Amino acid sequence: TVLVAYPLSRRTLFGRDAIMIFIVFTMIFYGGLIPTYLVVKNLGMIDTRWALLIPQAIAAWQVIIARTFFQVSIPEELAEAAELDGCSDLRFLWSVVLPLSKPILAVLVLMYAVGQWNAYFDALLYLKSAALHPLQLVLRSILILNTTTSGSMEASVMVERQQMADLLKYSLIVVGSLPVLLIYPFAQRYFVKGMLIGSVKG
């Protein structure tokens, strides 16, 4: 995301407006579920972890957020001074831009991590081996297995099973939410600072 967003934030990049229009176009008009599945299948990524990582590797919304941060926070004069000192673009990005961009990097990591953590639909489509299933899909399968049909059970047994199913459901919600809740306090200051990009400064 950074390697796309930073060049788009520089005024010296030729055709950056056309590239941004293309990126926004992909955000508005999604290719669709079946074409995406066929691409993943033709690339040989079915039943591999790459099927979850590669299609979600870059998101247009995150590119726009990072580009805005770089435009607001990294002045053109800094890049010009580094260029006069003989600093290459990659060296400037690595040595100057990234250390100054901790807030937006924390925001991007948190957004990607939460998106991957909560996504089970892609795993449901692309992964056949149970060993590769992410935690959300495992929790979903446990929840489905525990749902019982009301057959010829006694009322007391049905009530007890329903209570166990509810208890399991609430436990799964806690297990699914806990990692994100543990990470958020450490990234909160960066997250708030990064999300206030472009706000009015007084």
Where are these regions (language model features)?
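A hydrophobic, multi-pass inner-membrane permease signature
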Residues: T1-G202
